[in-house]
Every structure is written in C-alpha cells, then in structure tokens.
Amino acid sequence: MEKTFNLTRRDDGIAILTMDVPGETMNTLKAQFGPEISEILADIKSDSSIRGLVLISGKKDSFVAGADISMLDACKTAGDAKALSQQGHVVFNELEALTIPVVAAIHGACLGGGLELALACHQRVCSDDGKTMLGVPEVQLGLLPGGGGTQRLPRLVGITTALDMMLTGKQIRPKQALKMGLVNDVVPQTILLQTAVEMALAGKRAPKPVKKSLVNQVLEGTSFGRNIIFDQATKQVEKKTQGNYPAPAKIIDCVRQGITKGMQKGLEVEASHFAELVVSKESEALRSIFFATTEMKKETGAEGASPRKVKKAVILGGGLMGGGIASVTTTKAKIPVRVKDISEKGLSNALAYAYKLLDKGVKRRHMTPAARDNLMALMTTTTEYKGVKDADIVVEAVFEDLALKHQMVKDIERECGEHTIFASNTSSLPISQIAEAATRPENVIGLHYFSPVEKMPLVEVIAHAKTSPETIATTVAFARKQGKTPIVVQDGAGFYVNRILALYMNEAAQLLLEGQSVEHLDKALVKFGFPVGPITLLDEVGIDVGAKISPILEKELGERFKAPAAFDKLLGDDRKGRKNGKGFYQYGASSKKAKAVDESVYGVLGIKPGTNKDAKALAERCVVQMLNEAVRCLDDGIIASPRDGDIGAIFGIGFPPFLGGPFHYIDTLGAANLVRILEGYQSQLGSRFEPCERLKTMAQENAHFF
C-alpha cells in the first residue's frame, strides 16, 4: 500500500515530511493516517541527527484541504465521533511536543484540519500565491474545528480574531494571515521550501505578539473583558442563527472553557461538542448539501454530452441583470464579453456596474488596480451587432416581452455562427415559446440568473424539448465558470424556483390580508430559517415583478396560483418596492437603519393589522405550500431528482440550509404528517392546499426521498 507521508533527510539536519495522498488531486486528512504519522514522529524523535522538521505538501496547489468529510458519515454514534477528534488531538499534540523546530510550508488550500495541522507546528510560512487560503470552514457544515483548532487559534491570533474566523468560516489570504499573526512569513512559492528550511535551522522562536487594537488589548487582557467578548459574540450568534444552528454557540463555549480552564479542559470540551455536532440533524443536513453540490460538479447536465469551449460571450441588454451577468463572466470566468444595448446609457451602466464590483476588490486589497483594469479590458460594448460574429454563447437579458425576444433570436441567428448558443435569462416565459422564432432551436436554452447576479449562487439551466445535449452541457460548464451552481430544469411556467416561491409568497400575502402585520410575518419566516421574510423579499424583488409572474403561472398551472388581490391594490398606489422607494417598508432619507414598516400600506390594502398568530403556525402555512409544489415539480419532470430540488431551493431562495432542502425536510417531517397538515388547511382554506398525488402515495407507503 502506498504511503501518504514520506520523510527525507537533508545533509543540513533538516527533515522534510511530504504529505501526498495517493490517487487524489488534493490532500485531505483521514482517520487511517493516525498510526502512520505517529510512527514517523517516533522515528524523528529517535534520530538525534534531525535538527528540524519541515512539513510540506506534494500536491500542486493544495496544502491540506481539510478532513475527509466522508469519515463523519462512518460515525454511527457520538462516541465514534469523539474518538475521531481525540485521535486528532493525540497526533497534533505529539507534533507540537517535538523538541526540534517544526515549520509548516503552506501553498494552496490550508483549511479545516489542514490549518489545525499547521497550528500544531511551531512556525508557519505560506506562499503569496492567489491559490493559498487559510481558514476553518467547519461551521458551514454545522461543525467546529475538532483537531485542537478552538484552542490553538485563539492563543495564536487572539480571541476576537479567532472567533471571527471560526464563526464565519471565512478564508484568509496570505498578506492578511501575516498581519494577524497566523503565519510567520509570506514568500514567493519558488522559495517556500528554502525559507521553511532556513526557519527550521534558525530554531524555535516565540511568536511575535499580535498587534491588537487598543479595545481588543483591553478586552482580551482581563477575565472581565473576555466575558464581554464571549457574551457579545453569543448575542450576535443568537440574532443571526435564530437558534437554528447549534455549532456557533458550541464554538464560543470551547474557546471560553479553554481560555478560563486551560488547554487540556478546552480539548476535552472540543471533542465532546464536536461529537454532539457530528450526529446532529443540522450537520447531517448541511453535509448532505455539501456532498450533493460536490457530486453535481462532476456532471455535465446532459448524459454522454461534452461541453464546447466558450471563448467569447455576448450579453444582450445592459440593465441590472445584463450588467451583473457581464461582470461575473469577465471577473469569475475570465471570458471576454461584448455587451450590446440599444442605448449608450445602458452600456455605460453595465461598465460602471462591473467597475464598481472590481474596485471593491482593490479597496479591500484583494487585487491590484492593474488586475482590475485587465479584467475590465475583457468587457467591450456596442449599440449595433458589431464584434459578435465569433460569440460561442449569447445571453439575452432584455425586457420580458416575447416579441422582443423573438427578434433577438432572429438577429443572433443572422449575425452569429451556426453553433452559437442563445441563452435567455427570462424568469417566466417558457423557453419553447422563445425558440419558436429559431431556425436552429437546438441552440436555444434558458439561463435564469437570480438578482443580484454577483451574490446569488444559483442559475437554472432550462432545456426545452429540442435543446441539444451539447447546448445543455456547454451552458452548464459556462455557468460553473462564472462561479455559479447550475441545476438543469425542464421547460414550464416559472421553471422550478419561481414556481415553488410563488405559492409561498401568495400565502404570505393572504395572511397579510387576513390581518397579520408585515413585521410579524417577516419575523416568523426568519425565525423559521429564511434569510429574509416574504414581505421584505417582495419589496426587494419588486411588487410589479410578482404581479407580472402570477397570471402566467395561473394560466399555465391552474387556479392555485391565483394571486391575492393585494398586488393590484399596491400597484394602483404605485408601490413597486425598493426600486421606486415605495412598498411595504420605508425607504429613502426618512427611513432609519432598522427598517420600519410604511404603516400607510395597511390603508391601501383596506386592512387593520389585528392579533398576531403564533409565528410557528404562520411559517408552517407558507412553507407547506412550497413543499407540496416542490413534489409536484418532481412529478411533472421539471426537476430531475430530489437532490436538484433541494439545491435549487437552498441556493435560489435561501430555503433554510439546516433543514437540508424541501425534500430532506419532507423526509424529516414524514410524508404522512405533511399530508395530514395539508388536508387540515384544505378543509379550512380550500383546494390550494390539496396534497399532490405523490405525497399521498408516499404517506400510504411510508416512503422517503432519500
């Protein structure tokens, strides 16, 4: 069996320990490595000729990307998970206890268990390469750093900085890592090993004291001050998580116990808390999303089809969506883009949009002004069809007007090559209708982005009956290069995300008309786990947009999509939401930092907000509509699998990740229980709550999706 760790001795007395997991592109830590590392460390201890040790990766662009997550699924009990954490503690403690200097030479991803390994070394040096990132992202999987990270990190960089890293899972760039004291030096990759060897030869050195702000010095220097930090962090966590995620509170407790009662106690608490989190339903759900998205990245979207290379893209429309799509195409995908708009104003808007986003990177020192300018040079503009002939893909982001989109299809078929893909960013029009104007319908596809484009991770790739597999595969690959998570859905009104969202939003609007207050409704759904409430979302998306989509869905899918009368009343009062500063909430100079409801909206709707119902009951009534419709979408073949439905809902509308997505959540609730809830509402409120056939069958058979 090939070994992962290879020890070589140099003439100057420095030993190089190279980690290279056989057959994998990245290094990850596995349980079976424990005995192998312990054996090597015993060998080093017994060899008096070794004066220092350098730990380095044999992989091209990865130090250690973290622990192998699949190990956790093998843990049947909390005891198994605790043993895993304790094994890590033993190995890392042995490494730290070596009397010779130990230096970690870091290039590429140094995350999770990888950073914990580096923290157990006496010094760290990293490359200045853009691929080098350091962090502890375990919280994003509902976990905490279980290899001593909650103890070593605060002792190295300070409590406040360590908590910020662990509670957000943020990744740190080399310069920032040096500034915060996470690494001792940053050098070009070409001299990384040489520098690490020189550091080992120079011997152990006490870490330089981290430069802390005066406030942090005062707070972290006394037990009273430290308690303020922990209490403040706890309050912020409770506000952000609404009590739905157990990991952040446990991270704070690990640090608190370790600082007040010593490292040994801290490690004991870390192992116990880690074990509890591994077997928690929240972490299980978050890990399922991680595995699903990882699995999805290996798929082309169309079985047996390979994507064509996209060397140039054209965006039609320089508005908010067009500007955002052009921006992610140049900055993330590094693909040259030609933006076409009928007006110079639209073009200057698109350029300004892209520049503003890139300039943020310069201001945050993530990129140089020269790098920003090079990326901006990839974007060119035109008011006519010039410089578009060689486009591999054209993304249309114009007004939702079928005749206009038909004209665009004809223009592109005339001006571009026979293989050029025409991808429409429509949010409501069926792609088959847009393709009716095409002589090459196999090249027509939907590519539905969500606003704001640079922040929302999901795109829906919509295939109509005649879309070719190669067009699907190429569009999926293009979206991935833009940093997006694409799901392939079949053509149909509302596609998947807007279809399940519409019923949820309609139900919230119905509750509003029944006298529930705006803020109570929003708070109820935020407490349930959504990032924003449905009424806030309606203001952000645009009340006019919601009103436009509803009739299309009702016409194609039936009366259950009939929108409450609220939309017409609001539009009659020229309330479109944030975009025109007039919606459910106050905007503009008069609005305070904490959003206030525009109380006059109740008069427009002809209602008086009355007694607020139980928040759980409100959330349930909105959410069960979404769950029922998600299953209908699966039945109708709109989505290919429950997995795709979960990813679409989480990344497209912020369905609570800790629930794992609509289909995972239905499994948790039980189909029979969901059918009972839906039938209860059906008897009170009408046929829009009727459970779909598949749910009824699953309830009878006690079946699950996963």
From Swiss-Prot:
Keyword NAD set for record: yes
Reactions this protein catalyses: a (3S)-3-hydroxyacyl-CoA = a (2E)-enoyl-CoA + H2O; a 4-saturated-(3S)-3-hydroxyacyl-CoA = a (3E)-enoyl-CoA + H2O; a (3S)-3-hydroxyacyl-CoA + NAD(+) = a 3-oxoacyl-CoA + NADH + H(+); (3S)-3-hydroxybutanoyl-CoA = (3R)-3-hydroxybutanoyl-CoA
Gene3D superfamilies, alphabetized: 1.10.1040.50, 2-enoyl-CoA Hydratase, Chain A, domain 1 (3.90.226.10), NAD(P)-binding Rossmann-like Domain (3.40.50.720)
Cited Pfam families: 3HCDH (PF00725), 3HCDH_N (PF02737), ECH_1 (PF00378)
Keywords attached to this entry: Cytoplasm, Fatty acid metabolism, Isomerase, Lipid degradation, Lipid metabolism, Lyase, Multifunctional enzyme, NAD, Oxidoreductase
Region (3-hydroxyacyl-CoA dehydrogenase) residue spans: 308-706
Keyword field contains NAD: yes
Any one of the GO CC terms: cytoplasm
Subcellular location per the Swiss-Prot or TrEMBL entry: Cytoplasm
Example of a GO biological process term: fatty acid beta-oxidation
Site (Important for catalytic activity): 116, 138
Residue ranges, annotated region (Enoyl-CoA hydratase): 1-188
Subunit and partners: Heterotetramer of two alpha chains (FadJ) and two beta chains (FadI).
Family stated for the protein in its record: In the N-terminal section; belongs to the enoyl-CoA hydratase/isomerase family. In the central section; belongs to the 3-hydroxyacyl-CoA dehydrogenase family.
Protein name: Fatty acid oxidation complex subunit alpha
Species, as recorded: Shewanella baltica (strain OS155 / ATCC BAA-1091)
Gene this chain is encoded by: fadJ
